[in-house]
Amino acid sequence: MEAFIESFSAGVDAVDGFVWGWALIWLLLGTHLFMTIRTGFIQRKIPTAIKLSVSKNDPYAEGDISQFGALTTALAATIGTGNIVGVATGLLCGGPGAIFWMWLTGVFGIATKYSETYISMKYRVKDANGRMLGGAMYALERGFKHKGLGKLLAVLFALFTAIASFGIGASVQSNSLAGALTSSSLVPGASEIPTWLIGIVVTVLVAIVIIGGLKKVSKVCEKLVPVMAIFYVACCLVIIGMNGAYLWDAIVTIITCAFTGQAAFGGAVGSGIMLALQYGFKRGLFSNESGLGSAPLVAASAISKNPARQALVSMSGTFWDTVVICLITGLMLVTSLLANPDLAAIYNNTMLASNDLSIDTAVGIFSGGAALATACFESIPVLGPLVLVVGLLCFTYSTMLGWSQYGDRAITYLFGTKGIRPYQVVFLLFVFWGCIGGGDLVWNLSDISNALMAVPNCIAVLVLSGVIAKGTKYWIYEGRLEEEDTTPIPTVGTVDHPNV
């Protein structure tokens, strides 16, 4: 039995490496570039998007939650450990140049986030209880001319989303949370705290919110996410300020290494331009989730006059997540390395090892990135350890809340509203399991599902790109953003049966 589990795990590792390889990267990057062109470089509308995200709701528009609530719920799932550890891992494996490519993918990813949200809003439906439902599965089913293919891709997308929510959205996050608590030097006797006790507390805290549904989750995220993001950015800016003399050198280093492939600080190690590209694209693409189709699942519930308004609001999430927060994280890390020769020496030695891509595993590289981020944050006197613990607690908790709603929408599509309560119970079990141990196998399985979400979602965006381009021109470029979309939103299914 043990041999079977080892073989199965090895097979899962191989599949994980394949699906997160260059094929997926080029699919996502190609979609980003294509939709940037099709939408007339929608990125230039970021100021409008930010303004809309904090505007008051139209009392006559249809929807369940505010535009800001939908945005913060999506950000709750994306602003997380990836912004700390993910950027550090990209730096560790691809050199400082990876940060430049990470930032660039965020800029172009804005167009894909806009596009996937637009079709989610355009093809959204209501269930028998009047609850708004949307996402790639409804766009695939309602928007495709070939109904059979559309239905198949829709079911696959929903299935992969549900599976991913149990791993990346639940057990992986709770495992990180429990680890942060038990290893914290701020809590006396932290290492002696039973993980099952932490599991019970965390599970109850998550249950209190998600049992209340999307409205309860969005209300919590509206309060938690802005505070969480501001706190983290402020701490990064403090470190950058402490190393202010190295800020210009850090910017020059990042840009230079992006096109030369130099990886080591003052050394001869060269990761190569392709590694800088690879890890920059990977960490950027998967930090903001543009192209995965996750955020539109919640965005479809927003109160909005027309599809373009909420699509603009959603794309501002990618701007904040990758273009702003990941960039600030990168500058914090690079200035810290330039200011601390001893830390840079450790980084250089790690780079020598990480040039052997065989160690690019969920444990090895992830741990290396975490160690690098930890070392940089500890440069803040007294507050350093507190920043890490509080930040990680907030990030992991909010991620669990956000992903619970993604899975909720996927299960509703597959099984109807009757599947929601059983799903929530299973989700909470995975939260508890993550606290007491979890496992790398769960990470890899959910990682694969997370990656496979992108395939049907990108197909939907590309096939329906004409609809997106036409709608963008009508609502945005012809000045109709304040007008109401009078197209009736269909009601599907019944209370006890699937909505498809």
Label the predicted regions.
Residues Y60-C93, I119-G143, L156-A162, G270-F319:
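Alpha-helical membrane segments and immediately flanking helix-loop junctions
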Residues M1-T81, L91-A98, G109, F432, ...:
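N-terminal alpha-helical transmembrane segments of multi-pass membrane transport
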Residues T31-T36, T105-G130, M137, E141-N175, ...:
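Helix-loop-helix module between adjacent transmembrane segments
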Residues L27-F34, F41-K51, S174-L181, P194-I255, ...:
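Membrane-interface loop-to-helix entry segments
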Residues F41-Q67, T89-L91, G95-I99, W103, ...:
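Flexible loop linkers connecting adjacent transmembrane helices
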Residues E116-R124, A128, L237-T253, A264-A268, ...:
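Extracellular/periplasmic helix-exit of transmembrane alpha-helices
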Residues K145-L153, V389-W433, V467-V500:
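C-terminal membrane-solvent junction of multi-pass transporters and transport-like membrane proteins
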Residues F108-E116, G199-L214, V225-A245, R283, ...:
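Selective recognition of specific alpha-helical transmembrane segments in multi-pass small-molecule
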